[in-house]
From Swiss-Prot:
Reactions performed catalytically: L-methionine + ATP + H2O = S-adenosyl-L-methionine + phosphate + diphosphate
Biological role stated in the UniProt entry: Catalyzes the formation of S-adenosylmethionine (AdoMet) from methionine and ATP. The overall synthetic reaction is composed of two sequential steps, AdoMet formation and the subsequent tripolyphosphate hydrolysis which occurs prior to release of AdoMet from the enzyme.
Identification of the protein by name: S-adenosylmethionine synthase
Pathway: Amino-acid biosynthesis; S-adenosyl-L-methionine biosynthesis; S-adenosyl-L-methionine from L-methionine: step 1/1
Binding site for ATP: 17, 177-179, 244-245, 253, 259-260, 276, 280
Length: 399
């Protein structure tokens, strides 16, 4: 039988990408507030352009944080430290425009919220409604050890490595902005078999040659990350394919919070409900329910109930219970999807306050998620990446 060729591509970006700068600023502000006021309501949006940062949104809190200071520290940590980059931590202007959360929204969410989740009764959890309507997806598959699709997993690792060799001066001519993209070939059974194409674009010092960049990235980035057995003589490499990438960061492109939602999740391999994560506290189901859906999907796959699983949750504003829960195993399930939905209902509390309690989401843990993906992370300890429900799911499924 002739082998059917099936390619799938995902991309990632470095922490110096303009949109990712914004995500990190928004989540740094969120973390700073949560560290002092765990019950704060935060929706923080950031935009950056040449020499300017604008922070806007709705924040309701009993504490004070120095937003311009947080902004500058975040930019400094990313590596925009020189004015000749067109954007730097010391000289950029920082404007803020912050309101309180709308009373109309708060009305549907606030009941019993002053109670700590750990001490809340079921009635109190039921009284806390979702902060908005919407649909959220979570996904897991057995392509990698972290139960993520291989293309996005490799793209994130390349982007992280690009930053590492810049910051440790292995390749001191690199600058903060950069993107990676990986195309993986799948066989007729849907299994990843090889890397077909790797694309890396990285900002750099004007005096370095393309030949140096091409050689160094293959040696210090690609070889360090991509397993040799996945590459062959047919694997294609496109390193800075325009030939030059000196002007970058916010000087090259304006950035906005929430513009890299596919990078943040599954690289396009699974569906997406459209809601962004960064800058939002856990009462926003855009964030917390997407984390919960990943937690559910990962435990289904870890339990061996399916090779891949996509979980959809949906909510109505002011209503605690999800209006729908669905599971799609793409024909790989060991039990029916109806059984899986029932297992999910019995083992996971998917009401907003239940999710916050289950995943302990009132902590200042979010900046670390704002670059290199929110899922499949092995470098940080994230509660939604645990597989502590897998054994119970397997037992209850009778496997």
């Amino acid at each position: 039988m002739t082998k059917k060729r099936h390619l799938f591509t995902s991309e990632s970006v470095t922490e110096g990408h303009p949109d990712k700068i914004c995500d990190q600023i928004s989540d740094s502000i969120l973390d700073a507030i949560l560290s002092k006021d765990a019950n704060a309501r935060v929706a923080c949006e950031t935009t950056v352009t040449t020499g300017l940062v604008l922070v806007a949104g709705e924040i309701t809190t009993s504490t004070y944080v120095d937003i311009p200071k947080i902004v500058r520290e975040t930019i400094q940590g990313i590596g925009y430290t020189r004015a000749k980059y067109g954007f730097d931590a010391e000289t950029c202007a920082v404007l803020t425009s912050i309101d309180e959360q709308s009373a109309d929204i708060a009305m549907g969410v606030d009941q019993a919220l002053e109670a700590r989740e750990g001490q809340m009764t079921d009635a109190e959890i039921e009284a806390i409604g979702a902060g908005d309507q919407g649909l959220m997806f979570g996904f897991a598959c057995n392509e990698t050890q972290e139960l993520m699709p291989l293309p996005i997993s490799l793209a994130h690792k390349l982007a992280r490595r690009l930053t590492e060799v810049r910051k440790d001066d292995t390749l001191s001519y690199l600058r903060p902005d950069g993107k990676t993209q990986v195309t993986v070939e799948y066989d007729e059974n849907g299994k990843p078999v090889r890397v077909d194409t790797i694309v890396i674009s990285t900002q750099h010092h004007p005096d370095v040659t393309w030949e140096e960049i091409d050689r160094d990235l293959k040696e210090h980035v690609i070889k360090a990350v991509v397993p040799a057995e996945l590459m062959d003589g047919e694997t294609k490499f496109f390193i800075n394919p325009t030939g030059r990438f000196v002007i970058g960061g916010p000087q090259g492109d304006a950035g906005l919070t929430g513009r890299k939602i596919i990078v943040d999740t599954y690289g396009g391999y699974a569906r997406h409900g459209g809601g962004a994560f960064s800058g939002k506290d856990a009462t926003k189901v855009d964030r917390s329910a997407a984390y919960a859906a990943r937690y559910v999907a990962k435990n289904i796959v870890a339990a061996g109930l399916a090779e891949k699983a996509e979980v959809q949750l949906a909510y109505a504003i002011g209503v605690a219970q999800p209006v729908s829960i669905s599971v799609d195993t793409f024909g790989t399930g060991k039990v029916s999807e109806d059984v899986l939905v029932e297992l999910v209902r019995n083992n996971f509390d998917l009401r907003p306050a239940g999710i916050i309690k289950m995943l302990d989401l009132r902590r200042p843990i979010y900046k670390q998620t704002a670059a290199y993906g929110h899922f499949g992370r092995t470098d940080v300890d994230l509660s939604w990446e645990r597989t502590d429900k897998a054994a119970a799911l397997k037992e209850q499924a009778g496997l």
